[in-house]
């Protein structure tokens, strides 16, 4: 027996004049207008249960296909799923991607114009322990987790624009599937290491009055004149408080929601969509901020990468870049060798702080 067709415009005489026409269910409508499923889709759009395969375990959304109407910042008043799509595709993706490109371009232009910040004086060969083994382990664990999350996140969010056209949909699908799992496993590692980093470096990141002068002079980035600072300057403290603590808490909290790792939380689609939007905005801002941090810690400043790799800096480096910290060390207020390992070796590090 073949499939019978029906013309949905073949309405029985005066069918629409029935006062209850608009309230008919699908069965009643089928009698006067066969094939017209408008009543069913009205119920679907109204959020009536029974129109999806979501099981009872997904309550209170079990059987619910279409979400209610909402209006998120940047979206029209529409169903929640469509509102989320509008915010993501019309705001987060284009403006977030533009911000990352602008920051990357600005860093490249700055490096092209200024190059690596070199030491003005000659190195003395006398080493000061800037980072203990514990501090370096915490930093590198967090840094590796961050890179894994950043790379996987960028590919997942923006990859369809610059990777998909090159490798094709099949390979891109496998790539994003793999990176999604990397992202989900690196997230908790980032969260734990972020907590350790915060408490490890908290003591030397409290604001001081000297930070005001540093900020007003822009850290001497354009004048070429170093502004005296303690162990961490005002720029590093901004990264610590705004990036590590502020954005870090938002990124981790929203990520834990997306990974469904918060006990007792009902993971409705609306909850996940809001968490996704917050996560997207916060991570883009964090990546933009940390791009500057990564630049200064690698090719932007002579000796910065070596300091985090080996733990040591030359006295000249300490005096030129963190003069107040250096003065405290010379005055005996702060030990030049902070870890038991450094003390045991008398601070005689065999590594170079000039890399």
Model-predicted regions and their roles:
Residues 1-355:
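Membrane-embedded alpha-helical bundles that constitute the cytochrome b-like, heme-associated redox core
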